[in-house]
Design a protein with these regions (language model features):
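Short beta-strand-centered segments at strand-helix junctions
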Residues: 31-33, 38-79, 84-131, 136-163, ...
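Short coil-to-beta-strand transition motifs
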Residues: 175-177
Length: 214
């Protein structure tokens, strides 16, 4: 290859790299929110656990119109292993579900699949015990899949749409690259990535720390 061909080849490589750079999404920093085990209930199940006509009472506001309630109950696995004081989130939903970590699943002795919230078809059974009664869910116990909440304005700037899957670099010395992180876009959201306690502990992260979308 002569000098002219060398220059031509290098020029072509540079132009291709520049063109690729134009389509590359910007590196977005996202604050972390650590999601502890929690419960979503139908109004019918609220009343079974807490009494007829009972309404959940608000403890603190969460994004997306949700709130952490003052109410808690005990969850019980198939081998009668229990975890007490699991918080209930409101408002009530059309189907009851329990979201736990993989460590919780082992503690309870349940085979909870990793799913996005609301995707409970064929998931693990679980029992819930409240002050006024108990319920048994034939399905509804899941390990919540990691995801990023993003308002439309941020999604537009970053070039993402609802349902996109991304990779995220998290942590420093004991950091990790998490793949298959789902982008969820909604007007009610603020920018935040939700991970469970297992993932946070593995990367030594705390609420408010930032991760980077790759």
């Amino acid at each position: 290859m002569n000098t002219y061909q060398n220059v031509e080849a290098i020029t072509r490589m540079v132009l291709e790299a520049m063109e690729a750079g134009k389509t590359e999404k910007p590196r977005i920093k996202v604050p972390i929110g650590i999601s502890a085990r929690h419960i979503h209930l139908t109004q019918e199940d609220v009343e079974k656990l807490f009494g007829e006509g009972y309404q959940l009472t608000k403890r603190s506001e969460l994004m997306g119109g949700q709130f952490a309630s003052n109410e808690q109950c005990t969850i019980v696995g198939l081998k009668l292993r229990a975890i007490e004081n699991v918080r209930i989130l409101g408002p009530v939903r059309s189907k009851s579900q329990v979201e736990i970590s993989a460590t919780d699943a082992r503690t309870l002795g349940v085979k909870a699949p990793t799913r996005q919230s609301g995707d409970i078809a064929g998931s693990a059974p679980i029992a819930l015990v409240g002050p006024k009664g108990a319920i048994y869910l034939k399905e509804g116990c899941i390990v919540a899949a990691r995801h990023i909440h993003m308002p439309p304005a941020d999604a537009e700037v970053a070039g993402f749409k609802d349902g996109d899957m991304v990779s995220v670099r998290m942590g420093d010395e004991r950091g990790a690259l998490l793949e298959q992180v789902k982008i969820r876009v909604d007007e009610s959201f603020t920018l935040e990535m939700h991970i469970d306690t297992d993932e946070a502990n593995a990367a030594q992260l705390k609420t408010g720390d930032a991760v980077v979308i790759k």
